[in-house]
Amino acid sequence: MEVLAKHRFARTSPQKCRLVADQIRGLPVAKALEILTFSPKKAAVLVKKVLDSAIANAEHNEGADIDELKVGKVFVDEGPTMKRIMPRAKGRADRIIKRTSHITVVVSDR
């Protein structure tokens, strides 16, 4: 049984978010939650929220036992980028690219 949860358009860059996702892939959910709770990264808060949602989905929709769940898959895809302008000296302007991510967490009982 596999249950997934998604957070789309998360306001963090995929590169930074993948650093956190790689740490919890394949771990039991209790250990993964522990790692995410004490991680100092902003992306850890976002991934933890998605993992909590996936656990709740498994428990409510599938009747799964939380103690047996493992983080099956975690992947972070690139979302749309927002392009902004930053005024600079002498009438010039720089482009600022604000990246977004689509975070997907799949928990399974095997």
Curated annotation (Swiss-Prot):
Belongs to the universal ribosomal protein uL22 family. Pfam families: Ribosomal_L22. GO terms for biological process: translation. Gene3D superfamilies: Ribosomal protein L22/L17. Keywords: Ribonucleoprotein, Ribosomal protein, RNA-binding, rRNA-binding. GO terms for molecular function: rRNA binding; structural constituent of ribosome. This protein binds specifically to 23S rRNA; its binding is stimulated by other ribosomal proteins, e.g. L4, L17, and L20. It is important during the early stages of 50S assembly. It makes multiple contacts with different domains of the 23S rRNA in the assembled 50S subunit and ribosome. The globular domain of the protein is located near the polypeptide exit tunnel on the outside of the subunit, while an extended beta-hairpin is found that lines the wall of the exit tunnel in the center of the 70S ribosome. InterPro entries: Ribosomal_uL22, Ribosomal_uL22_bac/chlpt-type, Ribosomal_uL22_bac/org-type, Ribosomal_uL22_CS, Ribosomal_uL22_sf. One of its GO terms (cellular component) is cytosolic large ribosomal subunit. This is Large ribosomal subunit protein uL22. Part of the 50S ribosomal subunit.
